[in-house]
Swiss-Prot record:
Coiled coil: none annotated. The gene is truB. The active site is at 54 (nucleophile). This is tRNA pseudouridine synthase B. Responsible for synthesis of pseudouridine from uracil-55 in the psi GC loop of transfer RNAs. Keywords: Isomerase, tRNA processing. The lineage of its organism: Bacteria, Pseudomonadati, Chlorobiota, Chlorobiia, Chlorobiales. It comes from Chlorobaculum tepidum (strain ATCC 49652 / DSM 12025 / NBRC 103806 / TLS).
């Protein structure tokens, strides 16, 4: 008997694949890997993704295959939830670990209550300017490309975002652990930087894991290798 769950990954109608993106992979690296697996198994399929994750972030990435790629825009409207760690008392130009620390400060005098209240004060709608180290387009180039060339675009258009929930889950100074749920288009790196500014000591995003996109959960995701294996198994079942 053919396992319909297995062959669904080869359906021309397409499907959503929930993938746990590894550290240091770009979102396109994941797409390319899955697209290559289809091609090697004789099944050319369109593959796209919803909600870019930075290379230094891990967690849930939704891939759409086949005709499902036409529905990606609807998925991008969904709220996203993350768990992560902010390093207080230091800054980086990228607001994460992609660049070197500077402006280091001692933070032993920071009050835990003040940290939690600062996070709570950020909940709600706010305008957010995309960071230079981002995939936003400017005059035909990505901002991160310009940043790597040493250029800064000061007139980056701010966008309205909403922080629905921002909970501090642990404090081990200089590190602060958090859970956050945000609207489409929010940069968690910028939120980490802004929290550091509110506290007067600076801060950057040390680590980040996306745990949910709308109703889709990281707990239901597969590793990249597991998805590749599933495509290979499905192809072998059909050949039999």
């Amino acid at each position: 008997m053919i396992d319909q769950g297995r062959i669904s990954v080869l359906s021309e109608e397409g499907d959503y694949l929930l993938v746990d993106k590894p550290l240091d992979w770009t979102s396109f690296d994941v797409v390319a890997k899955i697209r290559g697996a289809y091609k090697r198994n004789g099944a050319k399929r369109k593959v796209g993704h919803c909600g870019t994750l930075d290379p230094k972030a891990t967690g849930l990435l939704i891939l759409a295959t086949g005709r499902k790629t036409k529905t990606i825009s609807s998925l991008e409207l969904l709220d996203k939830a993350y768990e992560g760690t902010i390093r207080l008392g230091a800054k980086t130009v990228s607001h994460d670990t992609e660049s070197e620390e500077y402006d280091l400060r001692d933070v032993p005098s920071l009050d835990e209550r003040a940290i939690r209240e600062a996070a709570t004060s950020m909940i709600g709608e706010r305008m957010q300017q995309p960071p230079m180290h981002s995939a936003v387009w400017h005059n035909g180039k990505r901002l991160y490309e310009l940043a790597r060339q040493g250029h800064e675009v000061k007139e980056r258009k701010a966008r309205q975002i909403e922080i629905h929930q921002f909970e501090i889950t642990g404090i081990e100074l200089p590190y602060v652990h958090f859970y956050i749920r945000v609207s489409k288009g929010a940069y968690i790196r910028v939120i980490a930087h802004e929290l550091g500014e509110l506290l007067g000591v600076g801060g950057y995003l040390k680590s980040l894991k996306r745990v949910a996109i709308g109703q889709y959960q990281l707990s239901d995701a597969m590793s990249v290798d597991a998805v590749v294996d599933e495509i290979t198994r499905a192809a072998s079942v059909i050949e039999e």
